[in-house]
Amino acid sequence: MAELKMRSSRVLRKLRAGEVVCMAKLNTADARVAEIAAQAGFDCLWACLEHVPNSIEVIERQIMVGKAYDVDTMVRVSRGGYSDYIRPLEMDAAGIMVPHIMSLKDAKWVVRTTRFHPIGRRPVDGGNADGAYCGIEFNEYLRQANEQRFIGIQIEDPEPLDELEEIVALEGIDMIFFGPGDFSQSIGAPGQWDHPLIDQTRRRVAELCRKHGKCAATPGSPDNLQSLIDMGYTALNMCADVVGLFQYFNGIAADIRKVIPDFGKETAAGGMYGKLR
């Protein structure tokens, strides 16, 4: 039998080659949507267990779809015990992202629970998809997991800023994701994207990641993609499935109203969100 190895991470492969990674966020539970995003060419599917009411089985199917196209899946985990962090990795997610890191101590705990010896003390199983169901030799499994799986953390609060450089420099952390949405409300300026502290922190994350050889990540769009790359960001979340579906259906509805002005009137009047138009 051929020697079994852990699937290499497309994200890490591109980052190590100095290339930019583009991600697509999945809110829906349908694996077919994940497949459409993978077919489109995105490097990484961003699945979520923090905000989205998806089961662990849904996430597992999304991971499997990505693997069929050599597309990574990054799972944003819920804040909880170590099992919440390692289960997506054991399902063969290429990476996880931990939200709302508040301190250097907080970040060190993430490393301790998600990295194997000699970096951390992640609990070992090996009998899951990432270990080829016990098909990878024990020490090789530990080595390959440390080498081919990425750990991301989110900076989206002011609390960790005093220790930001120490957090970025921490061994075992690959990606620092700046989240401007939560950051804006945490500093009392919700939605004020041009607020000086938001701009300053966005730039500081990029500068520190460049200094310490880490990946700076943040949400992006085709309109600001080049400016974020120029700033130093090397991983960008470019879209979300629910946004695309919302824009598509409402765009079609607007075209229909050019011919049938009352189209959707009943829905707008009686829907749970009230009159949308």
What name fits each language-model region?
Residues R10, S55-E90, R112-G120, R143-E147, ...:
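Alpha-helix-loop-beta-strand connector modules within alpha/beta enzyme cores
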Residues S83, G95-E171, K265-R277:
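Conserved anion-binding
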Residues M1-T73, G80, R112, I151, ...:
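Conserved N-terminal beta1-alpha1 strand-loop-helix module at the mouth
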Residues M1-N27, G135-E147, R203-K211, A268, ...:
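N-terminal amphipathic alpha-helix/helix-capping segment at the start of soluble metabolic enzymes
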Residues C22-L26, L45-A47, T73-V77, I96-V98, ...:
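Hydrophobic faces of well-ordered beta-strands that scaffold small-molecule active sites
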Residues E35, Q39, V75, G80-A94, ...:
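Catalytic cores of alpha/beta
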Residues G95-W109, I176-Q185, T234-I252:
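Glycine-rich phosphate-binding active-site loops on the catalytic face of alpha/beta enzymes
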Residues A2, S9, D241-G244, Y248-R277:
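Extended, intrinsically disordered, low-complexity segments
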